[in-house]
Amino acid sequence: MIREERLLKVILGPHISEKSTVLAEKNNTVVFRVAIDATKAEIKAAVAKLFEVEVDSVRTLVNKGKTKRTGGRVGRRIDWKKAYVTLAAGAEIDFVGGAE
């Protein structure tokens, strides 16, 4: 059993892009930015608890931070993790929350 306080720290927010919008419409898949150390089981449990939906599958990937130059120095952005969460048939997550 995963502790509730850990579940609240797993999901950092939705990842909104053209690709994620198309996936949401066609495949009932939602994309989230998640903690870099989060497991698929934790992500599945967190989405199920926070949004009260049934989750079919979770796919994850780690985006490597880009190298950027500032002045004469070379820096690097942080790595971050993205999760593609496929919801069960009929399940839906409304991020807007009643806006018309």
Curated annotation (Swiss-Prot):
GO terms for biological process: translation. Keywords: Ribonucleoprotein, Ribosomal protein, RNA-binding, rRNA-binding. GO terms for cellular component: ribonucleoprotein complex; ribosome. HAMAP family: Ribosomal_uL23_B. Part of the 50S ribosomal subunit. Contacts protein L29, and trigger factor when it is bound to the ribosome. GO terms for molecular function: rRNA binding; structural constituent of ribosome. This is Large ribosomal subunit protein uL23. One of the early assembly proteins it binds 23S rRNA. One of the proteins that surrounds the polypeptide exit tunnel on the outside of the ribosome. Forms the main docking site for trigger factor binding to the ribosome. InterPro entries: Nucleotide-bd_a/b_plait_sf, Ribosomal_uL23-like, Ribosomal_uL23/eL15/eS24_sf, Ribosomal_uL23_CS. Belongs to the universal ribosomal protein uL23 family. It comes from Shewanella frigidimarina (strain NCIMB 400).
